[in-house]
Amino acid sequence: MKLKPFSLAAALLWAMAAQAQVQVSPSAPPGPRLEDPAQRALRERQDAERHREATQPAPQIAVAPGAPDDASVDAVAEPGTTFDIHRIELTGNTVLDADTAERVTQPFLNRALGTNRINLLLRRLTEAFVARGFVTTRAYLAPQNLKNGVLTIAVVPGKVEALQINGKTVRSTVSDAKPADGPQAGGWLTDAGTVWSMPAVGDTLKLSDLEQGVDQINRLRRNQAEVQILPGQAPGGSVIALANQPGDRFRFSAGTDNYGSRATGTTRLRAGIDADNALGFQEAVSLSYIGTRDTNAAIVSAAVPFGYNTFSYTGSLSEYNSLIGDTALLYGRTFGHTFGWNRVIERDQAGRTAFDVTLTHRRSEREVNNLLFEPQSLSVLRV
């Protein structure tokens, strides 16, 4: 599914903080321009995540196929009894706006309607529900007297009656439903992350909400979730049946490459650990280390989904050594904190539009031959 970016330039805030700890010039000496190893590692991780997201297949959700297009109202023959209908009322409608409802019902007004044409109207309403993602909402014709020229159609919004994970019920509106014993989604403590990602029990079922939930769950590499919509016990009720056999909670990695710089050493050593949904909040946590001859970088990151929102944090610490001439040793250290919020504001069959906010704060310290220079702080807000 192609992602549609939503980007907007925002504010850039500078703050210079702290006092020099020794009496030296406030400006740092000219030295080699070195890239922060932690920032480089973060960029490589973000590039890999964007590539994985772009190549991730669309959620697999099994629903009934939509009804085919039908002929015009006048082309539908009525061999039986008909009634002249001049007004059509929809009761219980909470899913179609007034303009859409009028566009569907208008062709049937001021016409003689019988069983065949009324069935066509019900089918057209169902098609309108499905087109907007309300795949379990239905329209019904209640017993009534049509001699007064008014046709009343009852709309029954499809509700989420229960949520099942691998055949076990974890949430339900049915009083006698037996809850699952312990977490079912692969976490040690809870299934809260899966419940947060999927539509809430009692809500009107909408296909885009299901797709968003499956996307949130499958953003973790250990998950390959699929969803089926099963009939519930109550009229209009549906059971969201989530099937997922998660892989390992933890992934370990170690290796070496030659992507370092000449100034600090081309050979890089890498080690990391990733934990996916270890607790049950569908959280992603990672710890990583990258080092060269003269650099070290440690990074910790965490992300937790909540419906259409994803909250994240990344912290980093990096340090480096570099010679200035033959007599001076430059030592630098950088602390970084990044808080992120991603909100999917619209999604359809063509893609999705997301709103992304990050607040980054960095503090850099440099010293030459153990003489500390004035630290520098930078805060950046991106929208």
Q: What is the meaning of each model-derived region?
A:
Residues N244, A275-N277, V304, R343-I345:
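Residue-level signature of outer-membrane beta-barrel architecture
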Residues Q164, E226, A241, R251-S253, ...:
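Residue-level detector of the transmembrane beta-barrel scaffold of outer-membrane proteins
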Residues F250-G260, A271-N277, F281-R293, Y313-L323, ...:
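Transmembrane beta-strand segments that form the barrel wall of outer-membrane beta-barrel proteins
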Residues T267-I273, N296-V300, F335-F339, S379-V383:
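Hydrophobic, lipid-facing positions within transmembrane beta-strands of outer-membrane proteins
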Residues A15-A17:
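N-terminal signal peptide c-region/cleavage motif recognized by signal peptidases
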Residues T310-V383:
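Transmembrane beta-strand segments of outer-membrane beta-barrel domains in Gram-negative
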Residues V22-G260, G272, S288-A297:
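Periplasmic polypeptide-binding modules associated with outer-membrane biogenesis and secretion
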Residues T115, D203-T204, N258-R262, S286-G291, ...:
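Outer-membrane beta-barrel domain signature
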